[in-house]
Every structure is written in C-alpha cells, then in structure tokens.
Amino acid sequence: MIPYVATRADTPPKPIIVVEKANFDSWLSAQPEMHKGWIAAQGFEATGGKSLSLPGSAGDIDAVLFIKDGAWNIWSLADLPAQLPPGFYTVSADFSEKEATEVATGWSLATYVFDRFKKSKKEFATLILPDAADENMVRRTVKAITLVRDLINLPAGDLGPSGLEAAASQVAGEFEAEQTNIIGEDLLTYHFPMVHAVGRAAADAPRLIDITWGDKSAPKVTLVGKGVCFDTGGLDLKPSSAMLMMKKDMGGAATVLGLAYMIMDAGLPVRLRVLIPAVENSVSGNAFRP
C-alpha cells in the first residue's frame, strides 16, 4: 500500500490537466466559456507549478488545471495533495517510466505527517498511479523514506538505543537478514571502547547493531550510520541551543536503515552489512569526559 497513491479509484477520479506554460493561451482559447470566465475571475496567471480547480455545472470540481514549465521531477505535483480536496485524481500526461515513478513518489511523500501521537489524522488527495510508473519502486522508496523520517521525528524519550535496535530488527526480520547486537560491557570485550564510553552513562545501554544480508560471494557493501539517540555532550555539557535538535543525532542510523531496506527489498546482488553504534550520550557520575 502506498499512502495516497492508488491503482484504482473508489469514486470517479477528477482529471489533472497538464498544460505547458508556452501553450496556455492556445489551450485556454479552446475551453468552454464557463472555464474561461472562471480562470479570468480568479486572476490566474499561468506560471510553472501553479494549479487551479475548474468548476463543474453542479458546483463541484470538474478538473484541475496544472501549469508545467520545464522537466518533470519528483516534486512537480507535490503541492497538490494538500491543496486539493480529498478524493481521487488522475494526471493526463505523456510520462516516461522514470517521470511517472518520480511524480507518484513525490505525491505520496508530500502527504507525510508525523502524527503517531495524535488522534486526528489529516486527509489528502489521492493520485491514481500513472500507467507508466514502477509501482514497486514507488512503494519501496516511500516506505524507506517514511521509516527514516519517523525514526528521526520520534522524541528522544521514545527512541533510545534499545528502540533503535528494535527498529533495525524489524527491517532485518522482514528480509530474513542476520542481526547481532553487542550490548553494554560486551562492547569492551569485543574491542569497541568508544561506543561504550560515549553511551555508558545512560540507563539504556550502548550497543553495536550489526546486520548482514545477501550472498557471501557477492560484492560487499557496508553502511555505517551514527546512532546517537540523544547527545547532551556528556560532561562537556552542551548549551540548550546546541541540544534542542539532538534527538536527530541518530539521523545517520535512520538513513542507513532506510537505504538497507531499499537494497534488500530490491534484491540487489550484494553482500550487505549495516553497522549502527547506538548510544545515548547522557550525564552521570561515570559519563564520558572530554
């Protein structure tokens, strides 16, 4: 399932009419008088990326006008999911596979909201997947990026080293990858003293997450991502201005997990290894000294 991108519509979809900026005047001259009048009344200027809902005779939306100026890219239609009323929409355009895949991916990514702790959920417009699009690539990319965004957006109180390990286990388990975790004092036994030193003051023990997947004879690809779930600076205590965004100090770990998901989901012929040192750099009597 791809958020707000569907392969079929439950209700008749509204067309998104793509008009090249250079062709706008000629296109407009061929439109019904009602639409000409509406476009004029709205003071619509045909600049690239702008859109306008065109009314039907019953006062509903008949179609959506979109002005294209330049090549398609992943964010070409990304404003529309939030601008248009919820419902189903199709795009009438001569897409290549790459263009269709990127446009659908950008549409879905534009609907992302971190609302895990909210009761009410925002609704968006749904795009019918263009025929030329690679559905699996859209799904894979959106799921991977959503994973990365969710992990980074989680408050530090809800994602410590053990939580990052659990997220890694979920990704590894989906593709039957092998995972080992070296935790706490075992880091010293296996010669990872700095991972231990940075995280030893936290109640949630430091750990090294190690995931392997794929044919052992395939070309080796190793991804290493920093997993500092929160960074106070230890006893070299950071000021508030430098600490406010430190929940994102594990963004490297989130990114390699998202990339690993894409690699494994695509079945790429590689021997993949993912290494994530996961710690919370906290403050206590045994905190790391600078």
Question: What residue ranges belong to the model's regions?
Answer:
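N-terminal hydrophobic/helix-forming segments and targeting peptides
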Residues: 1-229, 242, 262-266, 270
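Alpha-helical metal-binding/catalytic segments enriched in His/Glu/Asp
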Residues: 168, 221-223, 236-280
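Flexible loop/turn segments at secondary-structure boundaries
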Residues: 189, 230, 281-285
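A glycine- and small-aliphatic-rich helix-loop capping segment at beta-alpha/alpha-beta transitions
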Residues: 198-202, 238-247, 288-290
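Short acidic, Gly/Ser-rich segments with clustered Asp/Glu that frequently serve as metal-coordination loops
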Residues: 228-236
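A structural-propensity feature for long, helix-poor, extended segments
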Residues: 276-278, 283-290
